[in-house]
Amino acid sequence: MKNTFSRLFGFGDKMSELEIQNESHEDINKKIHEEIHEIPIANIIPNRYQPRTVFDDARIDELALTIRTHGLIQPIVVRQYEEDCYEIIAGERRFRAATKLGWEKVPAIIKNLNDTETASVALIENLQREELTAIEEAVAYQKLIELHNLTQEALAQRLGKGQSTIANKLRLLKLPEDIKRSLLEKSITERHARALIPLKNEELQLKVLQEIVEKQLNVKQTEERIAKLLEEVKPKRKAKKKAVSRDMRIAMNTIRQSLQMVAKSGLNVNSEEEEFDEYYQITIKIPKKK
């Protein structure tokens, strides 16, 4: 059966050997028997495009125990990187388990893939397994977008996901490193991290992160805390001063200048100015007698 992701990203038959996990042991042996190579573990390097940055040691130990009992049913897949040096394309967890078991060689299929194909397969394989953290998943989406020059919408269509899912994951990459590290280490959940995004101030984001971890705030408590902070930092609206039209200013200045001229003539003129919402009021008192 063709792998949907591989087909959509243009690998076609080239990656058919990577899809053997859904086939029977007998089918696997028939399909890849002549293509399996025993490669020294010392000559194999991890995938440089591996999106997974955290490997669960306990899960690797469990896998090693399974391999010790049943053998390595599915060979790893590699490509030749340099002379006598191979880079893992798929199967790094199996490789790590075999290393823990002290194996000197590991069964492998050698594929001829370029850097873009190698990176894409590593990313797609891990996305299929759905064991990545939210940050690792976001990094995988971003790399696929860059490798294949895709929009978020196009990537969502190829992966069979909603565009909002892709967009929400990618927003996590804009968070400070400490928050992304907490996501990787599972100190906070993805929903905690997403709640921090509206706080544009990094100092505030890190302050709330510390509160989440120390006080073990749940998501609702975190959202309430952030809503309060946003209310506190919201700039207070200044009362708008009503604009005075140019014609009004000319009129006022003309009256003032006239009053000054009258005063210079010797008359003791008193005037008062008052400003109302809709008008200015000028009261002028001219004595009948000097």
UniProtKB/Swiss-Prot annotation:
DNA bind region: 153-172
InterPro entries: Chromosome_partition/occlusion, HTH_ParB/Spo0J, Nucleoid_occlusion_protein, ParB/RepB/Spo0J, ParB/Sulfiredoxin_dom, ParB/Sulfiredoxin_sf
SUPFAM superfamilies per the UniProt record, alphabetical: ParB/Sulfiredoxin (SSF110849)
Keyword DNA-binding recorded: yes
HAMAP family in UniProt: ParB_Noc
Function: Effects nucleoid occlusion by binding relatively nonspecifically to DNA and preventing the assembly of the division machinery in the vicinity of the nucleoid, especially under conditions that disturb the cell cycle. It helps to coordinate cell division and chromosome segregation by preventing the formation of the Z ring through the nucleoid, which would cause chromosome breakage.
Protein family according to the UniProt entry: Belongs to the ParB family.
Protein name: Nucleoid occlusion protein
